[in-house]
């Protein structure tokens, strides 16, 4: 049996996945990119040649994988019709366009994958696919599997590093699909090793979308507006107050998870960890001092040299609040979590404080007097936007 895979996107991740998946026996890869004339440019750039994926292995060696997608197109009917697996490797803000494009053509037995998904992926998918949403299966990954960069558009991409383990959540539909975990593992190769989370809300809650806003707030929350000489260190430059804010937001995540389990027995969110535990698990080899969250972040070697997003101004630099750390992490992260918290009846004052500060910085209005009634809520992926107003609706997809 040939597994038909549609890879959505034209960026670093789409290049990498297309090349790796197309190299597997019994796999047909179609690439769907809706952006401008990207499909035409990719087709022209590749010509009659093969796509090359350069993989930097953990032992220091390099492997070259050469393959060729069957088709690269802007036409969703060609790419989606009959596809067993549809994988979105585009930023969250672009998901809506792809869901709308696939809706008329996606088959009931399709597995729809967000790689990564970001919070609210399932709500948006269910809303746009309508009646089909109950049949299809949805899989959400927490991040991209690799650090990767296009070296030559349409022809060559390099994998700089590959994660060892990656978690995914799964909502099974009523129709029978290809086996989700083993199929995705086969498409990617030996690493990362994929593990299945117990619940899709575990992935949503543990996306920790408060981290970037909290660090920005910690550094710039009381900023006097005067330029600074250079961009401050981002993670390694946090203070104890920021670590305390991160802990408070994390505790509120646990509160919401516990409330959902109490209200809706049978929904297991017991794997929702506090952020300190998460750091110890995922970065144990990189952390030099792990006795508390503050030191776990500031001594994390993988964060060395990473600085705040800034823009040049007269006299130095100033914070760039138009960066994705706020423009994506608020509407596609914190607001989604806020919506779940409201449905669960749990107050999250620390998260609210960050949202109120951040929305002012990016000129948006989501939260008004603790309620999601702002004029820009319709641009977010909170469940309420789609009519999922209760815990039951959030969990089942039935409004």
Curated annotation (Swiss-Prot):
SUPFAM superfamilies found in the cross-reference section: 6-phosphogluconate dehydrogenase C-terminal domain-like, NAD(P)-binding Rossmann-fold domains
Keywords in alphabetical order: NAD, Nucleotide-binding, Oxidoreductase
Name recorded for this polypeptide: Octopine dehydrogenase
InterPro entries registered for this protein in UniProt: 6-PGluconate_DH-like_C_sf, 6PGD_dom2, NAD(P)-bd_dom_sf, Opine/Lysopine_DH, Opine_DH
Record has Oxidoreductase as a keyword: yes
Regulation: Agmatine acts as a competitive inhibitor of the condensation reaction where the L-arginine and agmatine substrates compete for the same site.
Binding of L-arginine, residues: 206
Enzyme nomenclature, EC number: 1.5.1.11
Assigned protein family: Belongs to the lysopine/nopaline/octopine/opine/vitopine dehydrogenases family.
Effect of residue 148 to A/S: Reduced catalytic efficiency but no change in the activity. 3-fold decrease in affinity for pyruvate, 3-fold decrease for L-arginine and 2-fold decrease for NADH
Residues annotated to bind NAD(+): 148, 324
Catalytic activity: D-octopine + NAD(+) + H2O = L-arginine + pyruvate + NADH + H(+)
Binding positions for pyruvate per the UniProt entry: 118, 143, 212
UniProt: NADH binding residues: 10-13, 35-38
Gene: odh1
Effect of residue 212 to A: 2 to 10-fold decrease in specific activity. 77-fold reduction in affinity for pyruvate, 6-fold decrease for L-arginine and 3-fold decrease for NADH
Molecular-function GO terms, alphabetical: D-octopine dehydrogenase activity; nucleotide binding
Domain of life: Eukaryota
């Amino acid at each position: 049996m040939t597994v038909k895979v549609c890879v959505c996107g034209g960026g670093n991740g789409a290049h990498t996945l297309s090349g790796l998946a197309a190299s597997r026996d019994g796999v047909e890869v179609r690439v769907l990119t809706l952006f401008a004339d990207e499909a035409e440019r990719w087709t022209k750039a590749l010509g009659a040649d093969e796509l090359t994926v350069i993989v930097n292995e953990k032992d220091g060696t390099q492997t070259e994988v050469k393959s060729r997608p069957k088709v690269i197109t802007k036409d969703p009917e060609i790419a989606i019709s009959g596809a067993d697996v549809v994988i979105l490797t585009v930023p969250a803000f672009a998901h809506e366009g792809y869901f709308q494009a696939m809706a008329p053509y996606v088959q009931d037995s399709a597995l729809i994958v967000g790689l990564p998904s970001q919070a609210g992926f399932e709500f948006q998918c269910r809303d746009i696919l309508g009646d089909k949403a109950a049949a299809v299966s949805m899989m959400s990954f927490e991040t991209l599997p690799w650090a990767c960069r296009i070296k030559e558009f349409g022809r060559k991409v390099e994998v700089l590093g590959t994660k060892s383990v990656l978690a995914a959540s799964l909502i099974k539909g009523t129709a029978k699909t290809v086996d989700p975990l083993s199929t995705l593992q086969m498409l990617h190769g030996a690493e990362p090793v994929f593990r299945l989370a117990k619940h899709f809300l575990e992935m949503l809650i543990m996306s920790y979308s408060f981290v970037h806003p909290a660090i920005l707030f910690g550094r710039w929350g009381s900023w006097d507006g005067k330029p600074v000489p250079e961009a401050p260190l981002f993670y390694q430059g946090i203070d104890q107050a920021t670590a305390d804010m991160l802990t408070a937001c994390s505790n509120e995540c646990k509160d919401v998870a516990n409330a959902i389990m109490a209200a809706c027995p049978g929904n297991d969110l017991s794997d929702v960890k506090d952020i300190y535990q998460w750091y110890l698990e995922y970065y144990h080899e990189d952390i030099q001092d792990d006795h508390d969250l503050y030191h776990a972040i500031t001594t994390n070697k993988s964060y060395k040299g990473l600085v705040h997003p800034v823009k040049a101004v007269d006299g130095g630099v100033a914070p760039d609040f138009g960066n994705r750390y706020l423009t994506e992490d608020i509407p596609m992260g914190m607001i989604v979590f806020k919506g779940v918290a409201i449905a669960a009846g749990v107050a999250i004052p620390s998260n609210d404080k960050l949202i109120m500060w951040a929305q002012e910085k990016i000129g948006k209005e989501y939260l008004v007097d603790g309620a999601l009634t702002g004029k820009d809520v319709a641009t977010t992926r909170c469940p309420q936007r789609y009519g999922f107003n209760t815990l039951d609706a959030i969990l089942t997809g039935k409004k």
